[in-house]
Amino acid sequence: PNVTFIETGKNLGFTGGNNVGIVHALHKGADYILLLNNDTIVANNFLTPLINFMESDEQIAAVNPKIYFEDVDGQKNIIWAAGGEANLKLAKSNNRGRGRVDSGQFDSICTVSFATGCCLLMRATVIREIGLLTESYFAYFEDTDWSFRAKANGFSIKYYPHTHIWHAVGKSSQRKNGNSQKT
């Protein structure tokens, strides 16, 4: 694989660091940008179905695959996120299905409130239209903010369950909690 390392000289956080990469990819003519946490394990060929799904509808701004916890007591079928839900009245957001055993209950494609930045495939044209991730969110909630901006501009945010990854939650940030987050 061809890898480009970009030295920023300081810790820009999840948001700022990803924005540096996003700008680089946009300058290189990327059609899609994938944000992928470094504490994830991907299934073989997980990306192709996501791209094909995005190709099916130009109004899709971003998509998440099904995301499992890496390992819960030896089980690898415990859901970490099946897209995101947000309640603006309560100023709360959470990952759909979090902590539930996957028995097929989240196997339908659907529109969601937000797509988590853990594994977020974004359409480049939408980034150009609505902007980068908001850097006042050093880490966390930048994905929710970006998703809401995309939706406010007429785009949709989708969950696509027919491909998946595993997330070793908090390993890179030492954050163990994440069931419910204030926005």
Regions found by a protein language model. Give the residues of each.
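Glycine-rich, basic loop-to-helix element that forms the pyrophosphate-binding segment
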Residues: 8-28
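Short beta-strand-to-loop acidic/aromatic patch adjacent to the donor-nucleotide binding site
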Residues: 29-41
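Short, high-confidence coil segments that cap the C-terminus of an alpha-helix
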Residues: 30, 57-60, 155
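Active-site-adjacent helical/loop segments in soluble small-molecule enzymes
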Residues: 140
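Short glycine/serine/threonine-enriched helix-capping/active-site loop
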Residues: 8, 35, 62-66, 160, ...
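Acidic/His-rich active-site region of diverse nucleotide-sugar glycosyltransferases
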Residues: 7, 16-19, 46-132, 136, ...
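Active-site-adjacent helix/loop segment of glycosyltransferases
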Residues: 148, 152-183
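Acidic metal-phosphate-binding loop of nucleotide-sugar-dependent transferases
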Residues: 12, 40-41, 137
